[in-house]
């Protein structure tokens, strides 16, 4: 018998698919037929590490009858979004709330924020001016670049205190030049993720028959994890005192340690994906839970991709740029857990504008960082059947999904 909310597992439901702008009042109105324990205090939104709402929330209810009433609201609408309702329990709720959000047990803020949408050529001085009146620590601005040295349009800023970082969030959607800038909570852990390992967005082309021998040696050096050399300084300008600057690419494309002095050889195993045919190897995300997209419209944006996967909430989106500086029609999308990446595969062959999108899973349960137990998976509505996609058991996926698609023609990003 389930105990009351003052002890035991309580009377808890989980909502999924909430609008990003959802408020406590919206949840109370949606569950107006139910008694919410402690009123507004009984609604607990789940946040991403960037401080954004994840589209999910736990709600503590007053009785088992209230839980049954709430479950009847499954698939009903809130605005233009339909909401999924799952039965949950206090153990799951406490675990998820503890391990989500920028203030979670898995991350430390230390006064960091992340900026997105910076104009091309944005300088650190412009960022300082953007946050005029808020003290930024010395060398506290990081402008990540990709292995080709191109600005990603994002930045990390460390303020002198967490209070100042909270004030900095008030600059969300203000402008630098003609671009409106998004400001999110961040953490030192997230800063590290952009350079730990620094090869996360690197693509290595298989050498052609007329390539110089050095090119082949570089390729073999990575695949065999042999001949690793220290990275040379260059592209990753962290801006934090004591952190060395790395490009992430040595003359031999080899890696020994990251900028925190840790061995990088681990990240080379199980991270090469043969699914795109024989012409390319792609290094996957540091979370280990990535979905590759192919066939994107030429003008597709990050927001289009976030909306495509709604109500799931990707951790990060990287739209690939070719050597000619144009989009390739492909993108890598990182998710926080293996379960979310598997759930995202339900969007395979769905349309974005007038193009259908192919998806390829690159995630393993073994790469999950602590993640959800089977009980948590059930709370998310992920069944064992869903964990098996297109006849391939998720546990058998070894950094390589979609081998059955390798014979298909590549869907480019050009219309």
From Swiss-Prot:
One of its GO terms (biological process) is mRNA splicing, via spliceosome. Changing residue 173 to A: Minimal effect on affinity for RNA oligonucleotide. The modification Phosphothreonine is found at residue 215. The modification N-acetylmethionine is found at residues 1-2. There is a cross-link at residue 72 (Glycyl lysine isopeptide (Lys-Gly) (interchain with G-Cter in SUMO)). The record marks 16, 20, 52, 75, 116, 120, 150, 173, 294, 298, 326, 349 as: Interaction with RNA. PROSITE patterns: RRM. Its main location: nucleus. The keyword Transcription does not apply. Pfam families: RRM_1, zf-RNPHF. Changing residue 116 to A: Decreases affinity for RNA oligonucleotide 100-fold. Identified in the spliceosome C complex. Interacts with AGO1, AGO2, TBP and TXNL4/DIM1. This is Heterogeneous nuclear ribonucleoprotein F. The gene is HNRNPF.
